[in-house]
């Protein structure tokens, strides 16, 4: 799941017509960064119309700027830099867990199993930070708010959508496999 998109967030509003933004102003969250989720970006250059936006990350930053929100790139900088090392460390711990028979051997699997929970907690924390640290100089004043972590929401005239992407599904599937491996290993150690 490291290379797959974990989550997507989209904004729709009347000033972003569906024929130009079929999925709204959409961004995709990966373990190592935020990517453009606009459909136009995935089409061939000669298919893109002049009035289509190519970078929804920049467009979302522009929208957020008007309410005084920090740019998306400000969030989770440390986490994104640490993600490759954490994945390797969690993988090494799981491999060690296959051979270690001492007390609390199962604990070596916990970080890899709980990875997506950590992602969601961190994601929710950053959304809270973004929604509660608004600049006073904003063109439009909104009260501090909690952006939608999961599901649909509303902020001013914008409808917001926030849902898992296929990377989250891969991560959950890997966790289920690890839980089954831990149960099998437990059975072996008790035999």
What is each residue range found by the language model?
Residues 78-99, 169-178:
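Hydrophobic alpha-helical transmembrane segments
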Residues 102-105, 158, 168:
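Conserved aromatic-histidine-acidic binding/catalytic patches
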Residues 86-93, 97-100, 118, 139-155:
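Alpha-helical context
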Residues 90-121, 179-191:
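Juxtamembrane interface at the cytosolic side of transmembrane helices
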């Amino acid at each position: 799941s490291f290379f797959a998109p974990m989550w997507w967030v989209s904004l729709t509003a009347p000033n972003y017509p569906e024929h130009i933004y079929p999925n709204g102003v959409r961004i995709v969250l990966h373990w190592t960064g935020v990517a453009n989720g606009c459909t136009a970006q995935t089409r061939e250059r000669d298919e893109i119309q002049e009035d289509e936006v190519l970078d929804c990350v920049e467009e979302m930053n522009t929208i957020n700027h008007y309410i005084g929100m920090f740019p998306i790139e400000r969030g989770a900088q440390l986490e994104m830099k640490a993600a490759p090392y954490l994945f390797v460390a969690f993988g090494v711990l799981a491999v060690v867990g296959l051979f270690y028979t001492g007390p609390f051997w199962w604990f070596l699997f916990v970080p890899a199993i709980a990875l997506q929970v950590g992602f969601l907690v961190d994601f929710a924390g950053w959304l809270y930070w973004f929604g509660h640290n608004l600049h006073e100089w904003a063109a439009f004043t909104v009260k501090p708010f909690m952006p939608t972590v999961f599901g649909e929401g509303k902020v001013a005239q914008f409808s917001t959508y926030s849902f898992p992407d296929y990377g989250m599904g891969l991560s959950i599937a890997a966790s289920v496999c690890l839980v089954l491996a831990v149960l099998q290993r437990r059975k072996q150690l008790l035999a």
